[in-house]
From Swiss-Prot:
It catalyses: a pseudouridine in rRNA + S-adenosyl-L-methionine = an N(1)-methylpseudouridine in rRNA + S-adenosyl-L-homocysteine + H(+). The lineage of its organism: Archaea, Thermoproteota, Thermoprotei, Sulfolobales, Sulfolobaceae. This is Ribosomal RNA small subunit methyltransferase Nep1. GO terms for molecular function: rRNA (pseudouridine) methyltransferase activity; rRNA binding. Homodimer. S-adenosyl-L-methionine binds at residues 172, 177, 193-198. Signal peptide: none annotated. Keywords: Methyltransferase, Ribosome biogenesis, RNA-binding, rRNA processing, rRNA-binding, S-adenosyl-L-methionine, Transferase. The record marks 63 as: Stabilizes Arg-61. Belongs to the class IV-like SAM-binding methyltransferase superfamily. RNA methyltransferase NEP1 family. It is an enzyme of class 2 (transferase).
């Protein structure tokens, strides 16, 4: 079954320059023998430093992306184009054959490498993830964007499984708040698959379970 997915406003970024000299940032970087600007922003490590950042409520949660990619990339049946749109508006193309590390610390190291060098692996025949020159506008010119939001029109998850290849399913990968106005305006349709707020991995699990059920749990 083919399903195109973009994880939107993902909380994935290197420590921004505004807080690169904060003691919490420096302490973590020294412990890992890295430059502060080469480490990933993580609210569990940089909580006090992040108080000074704009939109801090949507930032510093790379664990959300980690959990989402584990669901998407380990399903043997559901395949399609996979993109990540970060909180800093970077567009990352994900190879559907990638197997993300299950260990969170290994994932963090991989994402730091990706954001520093632009792709992983740095050298190799097959690129697993790459920071592209695309914009979100470029992406929605290729596909019709559907957003999943608790404010959308209520549908059953099975309806998502019936989408053809022209559609791109947009799922938020940030901890709090709503999609930006720009993203809401780019969407052709906005749906909800639950009467309750769901976390990113819960949304994906419901959809992937519904799609596998339609296929008879192959």
């Amino acid at each position: 079954m083919h399903l195109n997915i973009i994880l939107l406003e993902a909380s994935l970024e290197l420590v921004p320059k505004e807080i690169v000299n904060h003691p919490a940032v420096i302490k973590n970087a020294k412990r890992r023998n890295k430059k502060p600007e080469d480490t990933l922003l993580d609210i569990s490590l940089h909580y006090h430093a992040m108080k000074y950042l704009e939109n801090s409520h949507k930032r510093g949660r790379p664990d959300i992306l980690h959990q989402a990619l584990l669901v998407i990339l380990t399903d043997p049946v559901i395949k399609g184009d996979i993109f990540i749109h970060t909180i800093q508006s970077k567009i990352i193309k994900v190879n559907p054959n990638m197997r993300p590390p299950k260990n969170y610390l290994r994932f963090i190291g991989l994402m730091e490498q990706l954001l520093k060098y632009g792709k992983i692996p740095i050298n190799g025949d097959e690129t697993l993830m790459e920071v592209t020159n695309l914009t979100l506008d470029n992406i929605v010119n290729r596909y019709d964007l559907i957003l999943l939001s608790e404010k959308g029109e209520k549908i059953n998850p099975e309806e998502i499984c019936k989408l053809d290849e022209k559609w791109l399913l947009g799922i938020g990968a940030f901890p709090h708040g709503d999609f930006s106005d720009k993203i809401l305006n780019l969407a052709k349709k906005i749906y909800s698959i639950s009467g309750f707020p769901l976390e990113t991995q819960q949304v994906l699990c419901r959809i992937f379970s519904a799609c596998n059920s339609i296929l008879g749990w192959p």
